Amino acid sequence: MVKIGVCGPVGSGKTALIEALTRHMSKDYDMAVITNDIYTKEDAEFMCKNSVMPRDRIIGVETGGCPHTAIREDASMNLEAVEEMHGRFPNLELLLIESGGDNLSATFNPELADFTIFVIDVAEGDKIPRKGGPGITRSDLLVINKIDLAPYVGADLKVMERDSKKMRGEKPFIFTNIRSKEGLDDVIAWIKRNALLED
């Protein structure tokens, strides 16, 4: 089972990305989802209502505190959810774990996630990639979402591309508009090639 952690600031599109990935990949792969929220299970409920996945393949973890701690320093609640999901589905191939909304320093405990996708959105401004932080610099894949909003918020995608290359070196990043599915095929191709080790 490959575990992919998806993190990023509140409203960046983490849940939308996971919903789109399950919609496009669950026909071919044995998948499940774990979501994290501080005081609710709102993202899990959204997934249950909108995803093609059955309810028993989605677990919502209510962290009750700092979202970063629940995926990094004390990942015990999430590790228990991983164990529970693996018990339900022993042949699970791909588990997507969504962090609660966090800042640019969010990273996953290596025991919890084999790969990390960090999601930011253009509406936060084109300066976000150059601000760095472990989410930007260390994630296995950076997804720059909501590119359709660039002209409305004065964000320059060329600046974001330049700064992402500078901050990430050889690590990949993908521009997306998850709502319209633009860039989604590239994210899926990255998962298949890097996490699932397909050609």
From Swiss-Prot:
One of its GO terms (biological process) is urea catabolic process. Keywords: Chaperone, Cytoplasm, GTP-binding, Nickel insertion, Nucleotide-binding. The keyword Chaperone applies. It comes from the Bacteria. InterPro entries: CobW/HypB/UreG_nucleotide-bd (IPR003495), P-loop_NTPase (IPR027417), UreG (IPR004400). It is found in: Cytoplasm. One of its GO terms (cellular component) is cytoplasm. It holds the Pfam family cobW. One of its GO terms (molecular function) is GTP binding. Its main location: cytoplasm. GTP binds at G8, P9, V10, G11, S12, G13, K14, T15. SUPFAM superfamilies: P-loop containing nucleoside triphosphate hydrolases (SSF52540). Facilitates the functional incorporation of the urease nickel metallocenter. This process requires GTP hydrolysis, probably effectuated by UreG. Homodimer. UreH, UreF and UreG form a complex that acts as a GTP-hydrolysis-dependent molecular chaperone, activating the urease apoprotein by helping to assemble the nickel containing metallocenter of UreC. The UreE protein probably delivers the nickel. Belongs to the SIMIBI class G3E GTPase family. UreG subfamily. This is Urease accessory protein UreG. It comes from Helicobacter acinonychis (strain Sheeba). The gene is ureG.
